[in-house]
């Protein structure tokens, strides 16, 4: 180990048979500011953004904090976030206006997801003449995507169709796709963690297939490269690299277990090989892949659909054997509302897992969460009413010092949700005049 090591490029990659392994930031790479390649000299690390979507709205009385500002108390649904409360903002009053009918009748679920990141009213069709708008993640990818191996990462836990009627005459693509590269080009999400892993770290050639057949760790194939690298690293860098490799190996072992275990039989759901039988483990495995992707700077932009809009997935492992969509239409029934609360609480617990994992990943004088913006929410306020104002939305992370978290902010009624997205783009040094129905930037985020 060398305490006076010669600097290495931030683009250093460890290579082996079918493997191309990017590295996290190390001291030997020089200042984080150089790694960030930012136009802002105050930026100390690359800023990342991720968008997590949950369907069917929330039980809002248990979502919205009663107090505003820094002295707010976490509501019952938000209680799992207690450990990272000072690193998130609950944002009330935001509206997805373009998810409203505008004369198109039913289809509130399809419009909710389609308009969530675009701020555009989707064309009502169950055919091929789909039309929406560019989503915020792809607006960002178009500007900074060439700085990383993958321009963006789109993942989820439920497959989606590119055609067919899934909601009152709206194409299934609208209920299952959050990312849109253009008005007519939706980006389907990947739901198999093994394939996501290979996208992040594989080379996509015949050697990769050979490595898969031998069922060895990717770390086995970069061992020689890593040994040569470690000889020039400080003690801190060696420890950080070891933690990074341990995270990769943990994910590999979890994927292997998922392939070997028999699937749990749930009505209308049979997970394919490589997908954990436990839904919680499935989500957390995907979360860990996002953390690795951001750590290694494989991408700086991610979307994660925890379940498709109008998903009727049951949650028997938390005592809810009814379908999610079914109980979201509670009609004021207290028993159904309690089931919705349980599902909402489960989803928030998974968000807490992601945020804590990011906050544990040290990066310079801060953490990965300090150098990111993680938006979480739904395009529906209350699943029983199918309304799209005052949405359940929160924003976590420090945005490289451009956000002042630890608060509950309430904005004026009908404030466009896309004003938040434009504000996030601004913090990525991406200036856009307008995105969808945006009317400006959100005040008070810093």
Which role fits each region the language model picked out?
Residues 1-446:
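Ligand-binding pockets and gating/stacking loops
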């Amino acid at each position: 180990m060398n305490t006076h090591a010669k600097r290495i490029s931030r683009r250093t990659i460890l290579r082996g048979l079918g493997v191309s392994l990017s590295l996290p930031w190390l001291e030997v790479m020089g200042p984080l500011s150089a790694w960030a390649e930012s136009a802002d000299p105050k930026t100390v690390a690359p800023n990342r953004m991720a968008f997590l979507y949950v369907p069917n709205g929330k039980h809002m009385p248990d979502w919205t904090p009663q107090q505003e500002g820094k002295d707010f108390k976490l509501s019952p649904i938000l209680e799992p976030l207690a450990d990272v409360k000072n690193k998130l903002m609950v944002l009330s009053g935001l509206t997805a206006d373009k998810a409203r009918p505008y004369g198109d009748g039913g289809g509130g679920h399809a419009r909710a997801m389609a308009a969530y990141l675009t701020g555009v009213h989707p064309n009502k069709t169950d055919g091929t003449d789909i039309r929406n708008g560019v989503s915020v993640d792809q607006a960002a990818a178009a500007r900074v995507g060439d700085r990383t191996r993958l321009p963006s990462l789109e993942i989820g836990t439920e497959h989606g169709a590119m055609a067919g009627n899934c909601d009152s005459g709206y194409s299934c693509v609208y209920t299952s796709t959050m990312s849109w590269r253009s008005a007519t080009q939706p980006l389907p999400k990947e739901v198999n963690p093994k394939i996501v892993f290979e996208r992040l770290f594989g080379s996509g050639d015949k050697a990769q297939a050979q490595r898969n057949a031998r069922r060895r760790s990717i770390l086995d194939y970069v061992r020689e490269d890593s040994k040569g690298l470690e000889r020039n690293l400080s003690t801190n860098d060696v420890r950080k690299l070891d933690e990074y490799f341990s995270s990769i190996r943990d994910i590999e072992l979890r994927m292997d277990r998922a392939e070997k275990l028999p699937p749990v039989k749930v009505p209308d759901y049979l997970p394919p090989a490589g997908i954990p039988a436990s839904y919680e483990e499935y989500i957390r495995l995907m979360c860990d892949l996002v953390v690795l992707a951001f750590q290694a700077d494989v991408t700086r932009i991610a979307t994660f659909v925890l379940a498709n809009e109008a998903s009727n997935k049951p949650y028997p492992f938390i005592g809810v054997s009814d379908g999610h969509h079914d109980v979201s239409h509670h009609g004021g029934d207290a028993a159904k509302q309690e089931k919705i609360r349980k599902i909402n609480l489960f989803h928030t617990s998974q968000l807490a897992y992601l945020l804590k994992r990011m906050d544990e990943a040290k990066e310079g004088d801060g953490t990965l969460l300090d150098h990111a913006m993680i938006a979480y929410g739904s395009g529906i306020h209350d699943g029983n009413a199918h309304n799209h104002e005052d949405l359940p939305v929160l924003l976590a992370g420090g945005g490289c010092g451009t956000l002042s978290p630890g608060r509950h902010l309430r904005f004026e009624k009908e404030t466009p949700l896309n004003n938040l997205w434009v504000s996030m783009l601004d913090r990525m040094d991406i200036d856009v005049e307008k995105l969808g129905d945006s009317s400006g930037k959100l005040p008070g985020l810093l």
